[in-house]
Amino acid sequence: MHWEEVAGCRMPRCVAGHPALDFCNTWAGWGEPADPRREWLPDYDHFAVWAMHAGLVTGDACERLRRRAGRSRGAATEVLGQARELRSALYAVLLDGAGGADRSAFATVAAHAERAAGAARLVPAPPVESPGIGGPADAPTARWELSDRSGLALPLLAVARSAAALLTASDRPRIDACPGHDCGWLFLNPRGRRRWCTMSSCGNRAKVQAHARRRRADRTD
């Protein structure tokens, strides 16, 4: 099963190895005709829960976002539309590269990433316990954080930051897309050995189909 119940919402499992890729995987059937049944983010409520599920916002922030969205449905719908726009553009850039993708796709991702960078603030890093004085040499002193004051845009800004981090990583592993029917999910594939999003869904389905084809071929021989 490639989904699970989270805070009352059906969520796709995070199997990609990076939140930005899991965000792209909130749509299934890339390259296929549009079908609302392939959408994992049918409303803002699901978007907020997904951001929590992916580790991009806290549980408390998620609850605040859901309550606020209930009071400001128009604004919530607008943010959801922007998130879907970013998702489509990010998928194109990740799959084809910045040079191969439509320039408008990269421009869309860049605009969202720049907005997220402008909304971040530098805050002290959580303390790290260490027997030594001053803590480990590689322990960060501070970190970038998005404020809850970002309002309903918080999960959108968080995923844009995650996307920017992935796109600018010098040691980024190879990214592949699942060839399964009605899938196209992305995942990190550092060794190049992974083929499917998960063996329990697309992998097993392909095995069953291949077995059926072999049986039909045997009957015709």
Where are the regions a protein language model picked out?
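Short helix-coil boundary/hinge micro-motifs
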Residues: 1-177, 220-221
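BZIP DNA-binding basic region
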Residues: 154-211, 216-221
